[in-house]
From Swiss-Prot:
EC number: 2.1.1.33
Protein name: tRNA (guanine-N(7)-)-methyltransferase
PANTHER family reported for this sequence: 3-DEOXY-D-MANNO-OCTULOSONIC-ACID TRANSFERASE/TRNA GUANINE-N 7 - -METHYLTRANSFERASE, PENTACOTRIPEPTIDE-REPEAT REGION OF PRORP DOMAIN-CONTAINING PROTEIN
Binding-site residues, substrate: K129, D161, T199, R200, Y201, E202
UniProt organism field: Hyphomonas neptunium (strain ATCC 15444)
Annotated catalysed reactions: guanosine(46) in tRNA + S-adenosyl-L-methionine = N(7)-methylguanosine(46) in tRNA + S-adenosyl-L-homocysteine
UniProt cross-references to InterPro entries, sorted A to Z: SAM-dependent_MTases_sf (IPR029063), tRNA_(Gua-N-7)_MeTrfase_Trmb (IPR003358), tRNA_methyltr_TrmB_bact (IPR055361)
GO MF terms, alphabetically ordered: tRNA (guanine(46)-N7)-methyltransferase activity
Signal sequence, renumbered to the chain: none
Keyword tRNA processing: yes
Amino acid sequence: MRSFGRTGGRPLSPRQKTLMAEKLDTYRIAEGDGPLDLCAMFPGKEAFWLEIGFGGAEHMIAQAAQNPDVGIIGCEPFLEGIAKALGGIEETDLNNVRVWPDDARPLIARMPDQCLDRAFVLFPDPWPKRRQHKRRLVQADFLSILHPKMKPGARLRFATDVKSYADEALLTFVSDGRFEWLAASPDDWRCPPQDHVTTRYESKRLGDCKPVWFDFRIR
C-alpha cells in the first residue's frame, strides 16, 4: 500500500520542465530489480545516507552541501519535489546526490545489507483521518525493510507535527526493539537537532502540534 497520495500537484514552471527533461536522467537512480552498487554510484564517498520523502529538497540539498564526503539518496514521488531537487543540485554544484522519483520501499529492497549510515524520515504524509492511518509510512513492515539496510550504530531521524503520528511512530520504533531512542530529556525531541535544516513545509506549521524530532541508533 502506498504511503503517499497523488504524485502531481501544481504545474511545473518552464524552468522546472527543462530541468526534468535535461537533468533527471543524470541524477535519477535507474529502474530495475538488480542490487544497487552504492560505491559505484558515489565514487570516493565515505558514507551513505537516505532521505525518504524530501519534499522541496531544502534539507537534502543543505545536508549534501555540508557533507561532501557523503553520498545521499533522496526518495520523493512528487514531481515538483524532484524538480526542486534537480534545481538545488545544479545551483549548488553537487556531485553527491541521487534521486528516486517513486515509492522508497522497492528501492530500499535493492540496497545491500548494512550499507546506510543515516536515514531521515521528516514530516511524512500524516494521513490524519483514523481510517487512513494504515497508509502511514512508519509501520512494523516498513521497519523490517529498512533495518537490515542500516549499519549497526547508524542513526535514523523521524520528525512530524501531527500528535497521533508522533505517538504511533514512537511506539512502533520502540516496540521493534532494534531502534534505540536517544532522547535523554524532553528538549531532545521538542527542540530541533543542531544539524537540522528547517524546510518551507515545516515552517507552515500545518499539523496539530509543535514539531517533534525522534533520533534513534540502530541496534
